[in-house]
Amino acid sequence: MKNTNEDLLKRHICELEEKLLSAEVRTCPEELSGLLTDDFFEFGSSGKVWYKQDLMGEDGAGEVRMILSGFELHLLSETAALTTYRILNEETGGATLRSSIWKQQDGRWQMFFHQGTPAGSPSHI
């Protein structure tokens, strides 16, 4: 059985990942800024590399309709964690495998790195 603290952390970071999928957060640069480290970068499922400053425009990261499933947390240290999960894009029907590295800084967890990889049919990550 997993440590209760690890279970709580898994729930907390999953909630943060889900926040990053919400229109309210994705379209609000101030909200995004609080969830991403200053040196955040992403390898998008499109193949494009994104940096935090790319997402800080008036519209933020833009709106999406996605469903998260299969969330897993892998502790790297007391202040770093890797998350893996699957996303279903409700608009296109496409699926991607996702991974993120989260760092705890100044008492809060922020995303440092994110990657999306196009996936085939549903399967276990």
Locate each region found by the language model.
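A beta-strand edge to alpha-helix "cap/lid" segment located at domain peripheries
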Residues: 2-34, 39-125
